[in-house]
């Protein structure tokens, strides 16, 4: 009886376990697609440097359904500025499934995440087949075709200007006050 329960538990655990798709989140050298570098630059054109800038991988079944996966990671410093440390990210999609992915980066001083930041940038959306499927699980997929990109600021805030009527009323008021003296 104990053997039967143990076998049933193993079968249920095996059925319940679903392989998750995996991606190598990297934009430099051997860890990036085809050994190419995809440096991320700031608004000034300088490579992003240090924890003041963050990057995160966005994945979805289609380009219109991209959602953040994994944790935001800071950019490296010094000669490696503009690049993130390579890591494996597990997605919410099944291994072996087709997916759309993009790398997004932002200035952490302008917002806590990509959506909140006013200085931010995104790579082009890439189509990949996720790793992690099969038995044994396939190796994580590289970001084949990832190209470098730059951050863009929101620009100066729009300052509303007074309407013509308001300017006319202010001018008339000034003339009225001047005339009273």
Spell out what each predicted region is:
Residues 179-181:
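Short, charged juxtamembrane terminal tails flanking transmembrane helices
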Residues 21-158:
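Mature extracellular "passenger" or substrate-interacting domains of secreted, surface-exposed proteins
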Residues 2-21, 150-177:
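Short, threonine-centered small-residue motifs that mark membrane-proximal processing/anchoring sites
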């Amino acid at each position: 009886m104990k053997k039967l329960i143990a076998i049933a538990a193993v079968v249920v655990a095996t059925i319940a376990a679903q392989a998750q798709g995996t991606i190598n989140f990297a934009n430099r050298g051997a860890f990036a697609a085809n050994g190419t570098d995809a440096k991320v630059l700031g608004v000034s054109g300088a490579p992003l440097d240090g924890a003041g800038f963050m990057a995160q991988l966005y994945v979805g079944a289609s380009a219109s359904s991209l959602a953040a996966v994994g944790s935001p990671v800071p950019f490296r410093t010094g000669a490696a500025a503009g690049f993130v440390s390579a890591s494996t990210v597990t997605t919410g999609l099944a291994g072996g499934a087709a997916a759309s992915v993009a790398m997004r980066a932002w200035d952490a001083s302008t917002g806590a995440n990509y959506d909140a930041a006013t200085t931010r940038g995104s790579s082009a959306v890439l189509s990949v087949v996720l790793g992690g499927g099969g038995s044994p699980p396939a190796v994580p997929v590289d970001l084949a075709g990832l190209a470098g990109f730059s951050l863009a600021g929101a620009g100066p805030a729009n300052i509303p200007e007074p309407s013509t009527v308001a300017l006319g009323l202010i001018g008339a008021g000034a003339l009225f006050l001047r005339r009273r003296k």
